[in-house]
Amino acid sequence: MACTIQKAEALDGAHLMQILWYDEEESLYPAVWLRDNCPCSDCYLDSAKARKLLVEALDVNIGIKGLIFDRKKVYITWPDEHYSEFQADWLKKRCFSKQARAKLQRELFFPECQYWGSELQLPTLDFEDVLRYDEHAYKWLSTLKKVGIVRLTGASDKPGEVSKLGKRMGFLYLTFYGHTWQVQDKIDANNVAYTTGKLSFHTDYPALHHPPGVQLLHCIKQTVTGGDSEIVDGFNVCQKLKKNNPQAFQILSSTFVDFTDIGVDYCDFSVQSKHKIIELDDKGQVVRINFNNATRDTIFDVPVERVQPFYAALKEFVDLMNSKESKFTFKMNPGDVITFDNWRLLHGRRSYEAGTEISRHLEGAYADWDVVMSRLRILRQRVENGN
């Protein structure tokens, strides 16, 4: 009954349509929005789910000439005699009330966020189940969005497993290091990850203006001693920083920092970007962390008096990351694949001993959040429909 129309009428000189639903809720729809979203074949290409009507052809002051309704549809005639039909459930879903808009945004963008620290219970699923079953793939990606990290177990100890996950999502994110890349100690390494030393907490590739959203790391070979992985929930740490030191939070969320990456791998590259280390949306919510101390440039485009306060704020942020309450430490085993949110989590690695041969080998890849979210929405629909 929630999507059943009790009454529909034009208001405000026919510039608004009001619907009273059988659940006693009311919805208002501007006439210009209704005309813009006419679903007829002249105005909408159903095969592409895309609007054909041009803004140039839209009268922004249009009113409704005629309106009739039944329980499941509204029928509108416009001043030029154009005719539109709107389904009740389509209209109810797009109600302009604050509550309805918030509900739809939750459905579209999966905003639920579960913060964590050292108490994290690492979400774990079977690698083959994720590849084979939609229910498991949906659990994987929905948990990745909510918690920020999922471990998959049972992969092989051969390269190629992250490419399978890329196909499961859609496709991988190509960078200057290739579609996939090998994390192992190398002579004359072109990245600090390709050494045996400790890696401090960082996000990958802030030197790009659009850093990769999701990272995949498959353990092929693991060293006996050292090489433990460390992760921290950057969004949780930001909350703590804002509470403990609002000035430091303000500095890191307003100061543009230069990042650079220069070298040769998939091809030769010379990359430069500018990011705020803590990136906020228009509501002041943290949406991305951009921080890699190795690729933070020596160039710093700020007035001289702002340099020392920036370093003080950054030090406070990093100290919070490294607190025992914030970080979670674990060791990957051969066949494990760690998948995590590169915009939210910062990750690091403890040092390990170099031998005469490669003692630790991970294969990595990236995915874009747009690709991941696309697959997540499709999987939810399949699971809910029982397909």
Swiss-Prot record:
It catalyses: 4-(trimethylamino)butanoate + 2-oxoglutarate + O2 = carnitine + succinate + CO2. It is found in: Cytoplasm. GO terms for molecular function: gamma-butyrobetaine dioxygenase activity; identical protein binding; iron ion binding; zinc ion binding. SUPFAM superfamilies: Clavaminate synthase-like (SSF51197). Keywords: Carnitine biosynthesis, Cytoplasm, Dioxygenase, Iron, Metal-binding, Oxidoreductase, Phosphoprotein, Zinc. Binds 1 Fe(2+) ion per subunit. It comes from the Eukaryota. One of its GO terms (cellular component) is extracellular exosome. Fe cation binds at H202, D204, H347. Belongs to the gamma-BBH/TMLD family. NCBIfam families: carnitine_bodg (TIGR02409). This is Gamma-butyrobetaine dioxygenase. It comes from Homo sapiens (Human). The gene is BBOX1.
